[in-house]
């Protein structure tokens, strides 16, 4: 799934446990911002883990857009999560 600010790769696997890989470009911001976003993303994944049974997800964040507030950026990501979940329900 390709979006304006990130790419989300996903594939099915035999194990029931979902897995998440996160790649964030240094262009996203300094280490504090990248790690904060990575923690937020992992928490979002953890709370919705039951919806991703049998999937491997690889999230690749590109450069954070300067015109978007962080809250709006996260809102867009949440919308893409919902679209991904709709594909597998």
Residue ranges and their predicted role:
Residues 1-89:
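Positively charged, solvent-exposed patches that mediate nucleic-acid binding
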């Amino acid at each position: 799934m390709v979006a304006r600010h990130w790419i989300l790769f996903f594939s099915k696997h035999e194990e029931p446990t979902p897995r998440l890989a996160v790649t964030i470009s240094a262009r996203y911001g300094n280490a504090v911002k990248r790690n904060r976003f990575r923690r937020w993303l992992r928490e979002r994944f953890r709370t919705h883990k039951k919806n991703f049974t049998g999937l491997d997800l690889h999230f690749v964040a590109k450069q954070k857009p300067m015109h978007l507030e962080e809250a709006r950026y996260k809102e867009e990501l949440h919308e893409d999560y919902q679209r991904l979940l709709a594909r597998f329900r």
